[in-house]
Amino acid sequence: MSKVTVVGAGNVGATCANVLAFNEVADEVVMLDVKEGVSEGKAMDMMQTAQLLGFDTTVVGCTNDYAQTANSDVVVITSGIPRKPGMTREELIGVNAGIVKSVAENILKYSPNAILVVISNPMDTMTYLSLKALGLPKNRIIGMGGALDSSRFKYFLSQALGCNANEVEGMVIGGHGDTTMIPLTRFATYKGMPVTNFISEEKLNEVAAATMVGGATLTKLLGTSAWYAPGAAGAFVVESILHDQKKMIPCSVYLEGEYGESDICIGVPVILGKNGIEKIVELDLNADEKAKFAASAKAVHGTNAALKEVGAL
């Protein structure tokens, strides 16, 4: 029997759990939250759609009862607070690092063999913290960011091409942030051909720019962070792992020399299967792409340095 736990029953966590249930990715999905009644209520609400939508997955909610998460195959961590007005980056990292570290440690008490998928922000840094604090093999800790950024890239590509998003291929690597992500326009294809056969270089650059501010655009429209695509991206990553699909998905993973970087978690394409990260795929980047990746990694290293400043590592 397969089991997935989603920690954090906010918008992103609940959406992730809902997609996992609707697509019957696991036999059981457990939602855990610190706020009493929230995960229980959302789980009950989801289960009341089972007959309407025709799924058999069981969704259970609990308040801080990690025993209910026991023997999970995959655990998705969405816990943390959003950045508040006047809050420094270091303050946000200090708070979220404490939350994520505590959650991960509690999860491993009951599911020592679980694969962790990190969504909490700043995502690359929280993935790095989880790996360093827990001492798990690097194949078992995965940051979701690149899956979401690539999905947004494909959305904007499809809008420019006037086609379905499933007809295009596109990938975003680098840090999960609007100044650090790198939409790989050179690798983007439509019906197996370079998208530049169909749209101008100028239009393609506009697509890349829209992708980079995709999250900020939604925050401006919604007044809060997006949740449908982030939650679905988390579920997409979980499905490739749990069903051993061996999909190539850009995710934040620990590098040891790949792409010329070490001691960092950052977005690169990986093959995801039953062991988590089955393989890191090294693309043949050109000089411009390499320079952008190095700059992105430098920025992520800078954010990671704050972990030591706040005593999280």
UniProtKB/Swiss-Prot annotation:
GO terms for cellular component: cytoplasm. It is an enzyme of class 1 (oxidoreductase). Disulfide bonds: none annotated. It comes from the Bacteria. GO terms for molecular function: L-malate dehydrogenase (NAD+) activity. The keyword Transferase does not apply. It catalyses: (S)-malate + NAD(+) = oxaloacetate + NADH + H(+). Keywords: NAD, Oxidoreductase, Tricarboxylic acid cycle. InterPro entries: L-lactate/malate_DH, Lactate/malate_DH_C, Lactate/malate_DH_N, Lactate_DH/Glyco_Ohase_4_C, Malate_DH_type3, NAD(P)-bd_dom_sf. It holds the Pfam family Ldh_1_N. NAD(+) binds at G8, A9, G10, N11, V12, G13, D33, N96, I119, S120, N121. The keyword Membrane does not apply. Belongs to the LDH/MDH superfamily. MDH type 3 family. Catalyzes the reversible oxidation of malate to oxaloacetate. This is Malate dehydrogenase. The gene is mdh.
